[in-house]
Each structure stands twice: as structure tokens, then as C-alpha cells.
Amino acid sequence: MSTLAAGVFVDWEELTGQSKFVVELISFPVFSAVAGLLTNWTGVLMLFWPVEFRGVRIPGLHVLYPYLPRRVQVLPTFSGDGRRLGFQGFIPARAEKMASICVDKALLRIGSPRDFIHELDLDGVADHIAETARSRTPEMVDEVMYRENPDLWKAVPRGVKQAVYQRVDAQLPKLCRRAFDSLGDNIDQLIDIKTFVIRYLRQNPEILKDLTTTIAEPELKFMVRIGLLGAPFGLLLALYLHVHDSIPVIGWIPAWVIVLLASAAIGVIVNVIAVKMVFEPGDPQPRYKYLWRQALLAKRQPQAATDLAHILAYQVLTLPNLSEELLEGTNGDKTRQLIERLIADEIHRQLGPTHSVVRAAFGARQFDNLTVGAAGAAVGLAPSLAEDEKFAREQAAKIDDFATRKLRMLSPGEFMEMFYASVEQDAWLLYLHGAVLGLGVGAVHLVLFGW
């Protein structure tokens, strides 16, 4: 080639005593490997960090934002209100979509909310609640009675009050067990598992980051290392440039243009190879279709399933979270109505033939409201599930074991569909990022080694 291997700062031919061809045979593979490593390393970072959107406010952006195409608006480069330009990791930015995929592709395939709740020791949970409530039985009874009919309760002799406390205390285990049996049988109507998981993961995007970095840690490291594949592509580029000028028509294109285009292409190619090898195909394929036959993550399905189940059990589908969703979630009113009905039935059963007399003493309205007040007091016991960490972890272990078994039973294709679907939408951004970085590295090479 007629051009010299002389950069802006150094004449490499003179310095090394080698021809331009030899200099390029060494420099292009090195730079291409660096470009590949840099592209894939930063690409992995872009998947998860930052967890929260970081950017700067751009005057007038909120006026333009509504008119941008939807595909542009959902890019992680814009804040949700369209006022700031910056960046948020792909996975945290897609928390709602990923949560939806997690439910559709994983949770609902391995079991319904009823299946999960019945894996818990419901009798044990009920007994735990009853045991916790026993220390508060007088307080609960007093709270309800003073609220509904304070004059009557003040007039009741201490001995009678003690008898009421003891009667309620004695019936707590049975009442709690019946309540949890009923909750378990009606859980599908009381918990919208998809809405719950989506809302929870949207509020806690760091769990999504932990989920992916824990499950796919070996594959993420592989994605970075495979950036070194840029080296052989760089070698091919050096060999091609040696004959570029002799090729008709194409040889008219300046060599520096070829270097920039090839560098951008290498940045894209190593990214594509990394993503494909990690996520595709789920089920084993012939080598003439995929040289690696099966996605690397799919080959580790047993361990990946264990990691996924552990995170779901100990961070998402925990007993405190499920309790809070039951009582404070979108269907919390149904749960309260169920508890009220159970308590009302129990009061009527306990009072027996004295029911009409007591109802008359309380007043019809106050007596009926008693069941509502009692339900509210019972709901106040729910935080005790979160306070007893040992008990909560014992129940989480049951969910962990159940989810692990079920996730391992999924076909590799079904298992991988959940993970690939979560990054597929934004894969083109990773490829664009690879092209830009590759272009930058190619430009640096031209400055250092000439064109």
C-alpha cells in the first residue's frame, strides 16, 4: 500500500523497522480485541447500571417528548416525565416489563398463587399468629369493645372480662387455622399475583439487577471475555487492507473509511455473538444451525433455576410480602370481608343461645360493627410475620424448594424464553453501542497508526 504506517505522533515503520503490513498485522488485532472487550464490558454494565435514572434536565425537552415515536420514548435515555436526558440500566428501566415476563414465563408456568400458598405450613402460620396474639388478647378485646360499646364494657365486672379473655384466647388457634384454610382456598381471588409482582419489582428494581447478576454471573463474565474475539477479526481486516487497493471499484474507497466501517462492524459482531451464545437456542440444536448447539445459560438450567427460585422465595414471594398484599393490596377489601365473616361466624357460634340477649344489650348496629372492629384488630397482627425473621425464613425455604423443583421441570426453551424476552427489545441498543465504541476505537487507531 502506498500509505505509510505513520500516525500523528509516531512513524511506526521507522520506529520498528517493519513494513506497514507487519505493523497492521499486529496493531489491528490488538485494537480489535480492546474494542471487543471494551464494548462487551460496558454493554454488560449498561444492562444493570445505574439502577435509578441519572441525567440532566434539558429545557424544552418535555415539549418535544410527547411527539417522539413510542419506540424512542421508551428508551432508557429519557426520564419517565420526558424532562431529563441521561441513562438508566436496561433491566431496571424495563422493571415493569421484566416483572410481567417473569410472571407469565415463569411463575404462572410453575404454579398458581394457590399452589404457592399451600406450600407454606398454613397451620404453622396460623399457630404462629395465634401464639403472637395471645399476649395481646386482652388488648385486642378491650380495643374492640371500648370502640363499639364503651359504657357496656366498663360496666362488665373484672371477673367476667377475664372469662371473655380466656374464652377468646382458647379459641384463637382454631379460629386462626380456619381463617388460613379459608384464605388458602380463596387465594386466587384475593391476590392478583401479576399485579403484585409487577408493583413490587417496579418499586424495588435492585432485585431485578440482583436476579440477573446472580443467575447469569458466569455468562456475564463470558460476554466480557468473548470480546477478545475481536482479535481475529482485526487480523482479517489487516489482511484485507493489504489487497484493498487492487480490488476493482471497491479499491477506490479510501482505506480510512474501510477501517472505520470495519471497526464499527467488529463492535456489533462481538456483541451479537455474545448475546446469541448466552441466550440462544434454549433447546439443543444441530451444530450446522448453532456451532455452540445450546445457550450457555440453558446448559446451567438446574443451577440457574435454583438461584432464581431462591431470589423469588426470599425476596419477592416472602410471607411478610404476601401478608401485606393480602391485607393492603388491590383485593385487600375482599380479604378483610372474609376475615369479618369468619369472626362473625365465630362470635355467633360462641354466644350460642345468648346471642340475641347480647345483641340486644349491645344494640343491633354496634353488635354487627363488632365483627368489623375485630377484623381490624386481627389485621393488626400481620406485622408479626415480618418481625419473626426465623419463622419467615422457614416458610421461605418451603417456597424455595417448591419453585426450584418446578423451574427445573421446565424445558430449556421455556426456561430461556423468560430471560431472552427481557433483553430482546433492547438488544439493538447494545449493538448500536458496540458500533459507536468500535467506531471510536477505529478512529483512535487511525490517529495513532495513520491511514
Give names to the regions the model predicted.
Residues 46-47, 241-244, 277-278, 448:
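Helix-loop junctions at the membrane-solvent interface of multi-pass transporters
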Residues 4, 8-17, 237-252, 449-451:
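Transmembrane helix-loop junctions at the membrane interface of multipass transporters and ion channels
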Residues 228, 232-248, 252-272:
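Core alpha-helical transmembrane segments of integral membrane proteins
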Residues 131-139, 227-229, 242-245, 337-344, ...:
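Short, charged low-complexity intrinsically disordered segments located at boundaries
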Residues 197, 219-240, 423-448:
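Bilayer-spanning, highly hydrophobic alpha-helical transmembrane segments
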Residues 4-216, 253, 257-422:
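Large intracellular
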